[in-house]
């Protein structure tokens, strides 16, 4: 009964995390290769890389659960998030002491899982390289990261690398439908499309959005999903572009500022959606290039932490210049 209660309070990303390799919904080629390694008892050191929410951690945890019973799991598997402690201490401390000891009741190797390994310093990675070399006989390492370029070549060459790409819609929808059925959530068709669109290939993100929207609203539809995550709706973007192109600067600025405040929108999200909108509209090539170049500059400024109101003014100005260029070309 207690376990059932615990399960009910779990975040859905953990509650529905796959426990076996066959339960994973994507990357069949990677899974079949790893399954063959396990069956032939030839599991190498592994390096999983790719964007978040694509099944990297779930895959190695499913491998560990396949290799060890629940009783053995804690003594045979060390799971660390490298971004908690990025320095050399994590390698010389918990990793070294775990890798260097043998267990008495289980033959074979232990597994060390280092999540977010790309956050480790170069010194820590060099120390890890030596530990990997020294304890290969009784320990296998699995490094998980988003950016392969941040892992030193010496570690890359000692691991078998697998890239986990973003999931496509056909893979995400059945898994979402399974969770929706289990949790008895009322989801509309446009709500499902919104979940998949906003997740952008990230299964974890789609489940988190689904759970938070279902807790905030009785029905998970497009408007409620976008409102819950504070993302602009299509009609909002249509209005914003319309104001920027057809109203004077002050009116457009005040209208967009009011909408941002009312719905709690971030300029970064507005910029992303406006960018998609621009590619669907007929514009002269020269005009489109100039506008996209200016939008890229604004996005760069936003990532540097500049004032949103100033960048909003810059965005509106870019569109007003675009309008004048279109008028000049037409005449």
Where are these regions (language model features)?
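Short hinge/gating elements
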Residues: 14-21, 77-78, 157, 161, ...
